[in-house]
């Protein structure tokens, strides 16, 4: 009996050590660098998807969406005389994804640019991805099939753990009427967005250059803003104002999808996906209000 107890304590201690090491790895290594790693992975995913562009017929409108808009199924678009191919670029809100488009053999007709591209702090992630990027990593996308899947296991696991409580609340309420209660915890920012730092200014100038090059190459652009979580986003209005300021001299239209489509009253299944009904509403708005820019 004593031997069994000692063996149990020893094995338990070993399991405890392993658990502690895993926890430290997640807290100290994985999570802090996740945005840069995920953005770099998104970059390789986008490269493989861009290879499909030459196979698309001239009659097809190619929509390079981002985040939620990039996951809208093509069957949700209903206009019979305007076939849609949703390229579904990952991280299209990030500047590195926009720069990737410049290397494509054929530019998409319409690109939706997420307004959180200009959220403070993104310039750090962008620089990390740029520093880590190399031609060898681009070539790796051809040999790693999971990078070309629409949902990578890491993303699914991360978003499930991050949005478990949000999913439960969504299933219970079925919509976002309770969003007003969240504003008590996260009050909206008052006044204009804070002035950009030196790094942010350089980042925004780089974004302007990239957007200008895309426009000169014949690509139609549109800025879109959509809440990507159930929680109230205090950066919503400042993001919209900053993006509108950037878009004005470039003649880029700006759409607030949350207000235009009534997204606050639409149900979400988790942090990434819209329900089929909400997705159809989103797709129809894109068809009627955004895609005509490519005509």
Regions found by a protein language model. Give the residues of each.
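N-terminal Lys/Arg-rich, disordered targeting/topogenic segments
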Residues: 1-12
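Membrane-embedded segments
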Residues: 64, 68-145
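Extracellular serine-dependent O-acyl
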Residues: 221-224, 240-266, 285, 289
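Alpha-helical transmembrane signal-anchor/signal-peptide segments
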Residues: 33-57
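Hydrophobic membrane-insertion alpha-helices, especially the h-region
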Residues: 10-33
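Acidic-and-aromatic substrate-binding clefts and catalytic sites of carbohydrate-active enzymes
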Residues: 91-94, 199-203, 229-238
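Histidine-centered active-site loop/cap adjacent to the catalytic His
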Residues: 268-295
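Secreted/periplasmic serine-hydrolase-like ester/acetyl group-modifying domain
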Residues: 115, 124-222
């Amino acid at each position: 009996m004593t031997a069994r107890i000692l063996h149990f304590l020893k094995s338990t201690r070993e399991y405890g050590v392993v658990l502690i090491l895993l926890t430290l790895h997640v807290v100290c290594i994985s999570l802090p660098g996740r945005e840069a790693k995920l953005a770099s992975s998104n970059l390789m995913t986008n490269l493989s998807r861009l290879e499909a562009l030459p196979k698309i017929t001239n009659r097809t409108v190619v929509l390079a969406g981002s985040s939620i808009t990039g996951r809208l199924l093509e069957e949700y678009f209903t206009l019979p005389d305007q076939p849609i191919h949703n390229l579904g670029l990952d991280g299209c809100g990030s500047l590195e994804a926009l720069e990737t488009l410049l290397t494509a053999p054929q530019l998409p007709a319409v690109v939706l640019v997420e307004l959180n591209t200009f959220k403070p702090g993104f310039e750090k992630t962008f620089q990390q991805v740029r520093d880590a990027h190399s031609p060898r990593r681009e070539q790796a996308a051809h040999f790693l099939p999971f990078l070309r899947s629409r949902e990578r296991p890491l993303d699914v696991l991360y978003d499930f753990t991050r949005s478990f409580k949000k999913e439960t609340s969504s299933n219970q309420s079925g919509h976002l009427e309770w969003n007003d209660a969240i504003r008590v915890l996260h009050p909206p920012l008052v006044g204009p967005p804070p002035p950009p730092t030196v790094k942010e200014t350089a980042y925004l100038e780089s974004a302007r250059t990239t957007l200008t090059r895309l426009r000169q190459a014949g690509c139609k652009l549109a800025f879109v803003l959509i809440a990507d979580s159930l929680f109230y986003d205090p950066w919503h209005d400042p993001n919209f104002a900053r993006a509108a300021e950037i878009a004005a001299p470039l003649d880029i239209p700006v759409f607030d999808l949350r207000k235009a489509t009534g997204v606050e009253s639409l149900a979400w299944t988790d942090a990434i996906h819209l329900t089929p009904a909400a997705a159809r509403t989103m797709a129809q708005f894109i068809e009627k209000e955004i895609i005509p820019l490519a005509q």
